[in-house]
């Protein structure tokens, strides 16, 4: 895969439930703590090394942001780093919440 694919929040959740992909939330720490998709990994500059240790380059990854814009850039970056199956969630966390998909809160 030389480019990422866009998927709906429902498609993303289905892949996560099947343990077929890792869900990476790139929103800031405050917003992630307030609410994030269930089972999401908070991907930041600080946690990137941990992410790389947990997931091989061929493991499917799904990137989610606020509205589905920033995740595209992050998806391209992951492809440039050698990840081969990368997806971006259309509409971001806003669409995830609107669709009533599971969320978690910290604290």
Swiss-Prot record:
GO terms for molecular function: thiosulfate-cyanide sulfurtransferase activity. Keywords: Cytoplasm, Transferase. Residues 17-105 form the Rhodanese domain. The keyword Transferase applies. The active site is at 65 (cysteine persulfide intermediate). It catalyses: thiosulfate + hydrogen cyanide = thiocyanate + sulfite + 2 H(+); thiosulfate + [thioredoxin]-dithiol = [thioredoxin]-disulfide + hydrogen sulfide + sulfite + 2 H(+). Disulfide bonds: none annotated. GO terms for biological process: glycerol metabolic process. Its main location: cytoplasm. One of its GO terms (cellular component) is cytoplasm. The keyword Transferase applies. Its EC number is 2.8.1.1. It comes from the Bacteria. Gene3D superfamilies: Rhodanese-like domain. Belongs to the GlpE family. This is Thiosulfate sulfurtransferase GlpE. It comes from Pasteurella multocida (strain Pm70).
């Amino acid at each position: 895969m030389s480019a990422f694919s866009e998927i709906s929040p429902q498609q993303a959740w289905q892949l996560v439930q099947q343990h077929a992909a890792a869900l990476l939330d790139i929103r800031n720490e405050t917003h992630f703590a307030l609410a994030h998709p269930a089972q999401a990994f908070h991907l930041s500059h600080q946690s990137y090394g941990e992410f790389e240790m947990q997931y091989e380059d061929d493991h499917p990854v799904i990137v989610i942001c606020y509205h589905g814009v920033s995740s595209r850039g992050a998806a391209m970056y992951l492809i440039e780093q050698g990840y081969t199956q990368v997806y971006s969630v259309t509409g971001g966390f806003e669409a995830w919440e609107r669709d009533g998909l599971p969320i978690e809160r910290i604290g």
